[in-house]
Curated annotation (Swiss-Prot):
Gene3D superfamilies for this protein: 3.40.50.1360
Pfam family, any one: Glucosamine_iso
Keywords assigned: Carbohydrate metabolism, Hydrolase
Protein origin, superkingdom: Bacteria
GN (gene name): nagB
Organism: Bacillus cereus (strain ATCC 14579 / DSM 31 / CCUG 7414 / JCM 2152 / NBRC 15305 / NCIMB 9373 / NCTC 2599 / NRRL B-3711)
Protein's pathway: Amino-sugar metabolism; N-acetylneuraminate degradation; D-fructose 6-phosphate from N-acetylneuraminate: step 5/5
Protein name according to UniProt: Glucosamine-6-phosphate deaminase
Top-level enzyme category: hydrolase
Presence of keyword Hydrolase: yes
Catalytically driven reaction(s): alpha-D-glucosamine 6-phosphate + H2O = beta-D-fructose 6-phosphate + NH4(+)
Function: Catalyzes the reversible isomerization-deamination of glucosamine 6-phosphate (GlcN6P) to form fructose 6-phosphate (Fru6P) and ammonium ion.
GO cellular component: cytoplasm
Active site: 63, 129, 131, 136
Length: 262
């Protein structure tokens, strides 16, 4: 696992973009696993600013709310259109259909899409309780794409995007933890003290389904980009035989991070 320590949101965005750019430029027909929310916003802005050539890129999104129309500004369909799809020409884009009449069939359909488009790089944020995607504590590590009931803490965290609490969806479709772990490479980003406990568990906690992000301890190719606040609860002995620590200057000045992330 690589840990890239940044000082600002701008550094995080630049570092994340560099890793994505490398995958896009070196793979013939790459597939990117996309995340939503505030964590990847800067990275997507860098993709727009640099006019990244995404004409050969397929995207698969992590999740989508259930029963939230695609044109709703809080849907992840809308989010992706606004952030990327209206700005860059992708080969193909996929987002789970939370409006499907048969949600179980939609989950199976999405698993088929993932099987046909193996993810080269999966972007992840991390919830305050350690969730990845909408996979809450207690989710089996081998879970496929599934329908989940959102916990109260997750709904409260997302309340800022909605006018009132009753507007926040109660369910979502999410790629399962087993689905996420099939990605060839994972990029997880975390900023701020609110993520510190979850980041501590991810990096130095017990491998446990009670903290979904700890599954990444067993993934062979993970890069975590985090600021000092997000890393503030980690012990100083964060680097060991399983984890290498880098800075943004390492990423930009030599190839060590890129090589270990391939």
């Amino acid at each position: 696992m690589n840990i890239l320590v940044v000082k600002t949101p701008e550094e995080l965005a630049e570092a994340g973009y560099k890793l994505i750019e490398e995958v896009v430029k070196t793979k013939e027909n790459p597939t990117l696993g996309m995340a939503t929310g505030s964590s990847p916003l800067g990275i997507y802005a860098e993709m727009r600013k640099n006019k990244l050539d995404t004409s050969r890129v397929t995207t698969v999104n992590l999740d989508e709310y259930v029963n939230l129309p695609h044109e709703d500004k809080n849907s992840y369909h809308y989010f992706m259109q606004e952030q990327l799809f209206d700005h860059l020409p992708f080969k193909q884009t996929y987002v789970p259909n939370g409006m499907a009449s048969d949600l179980e069939e939609e989950c199976k359909r999405y698993e088929s899409i993932l099987a046909a488009n193996p993810v080269d790089l999966q972007i992840l944020g991390i919830g305050e309780n350690g969730h990845i995607g909408f996979n809450e504590p207690g989710t089996p590590f081998n879970s496929p794409t599934n329908i989940v009931e959102l916990t109260e803490s997750t709904r409260q965290a997302n309340l800022r995007f909605f006018e009132k609490e009753e507007d926040v969806p109660t369910h979502a479709i999410t790629m399962g933890i087993g689905s996420i772990m099939k990605a060839k490479q994972v990029l997880l980003v975390a900023m701020g003290s609110k993520k510190a406990e979850a980041v501590k568990e991810l990096l130095q906690g017990e491998y446990s389904e009670e903290c979904p992000a700890t599954v990444l301890q067993r993934h062979p190719n993970v890069t975590v980009i985090a600021d000092q606040e997000a890393l503030s609860l980690c012990s100083e002995a964060i680097a060991d035989e399983h984890r290498q620590v880098f800075t943004i200057s390492d990423l930009l000045s030599d190839s060590r991070v890129g090589e270990t992330a391939n």
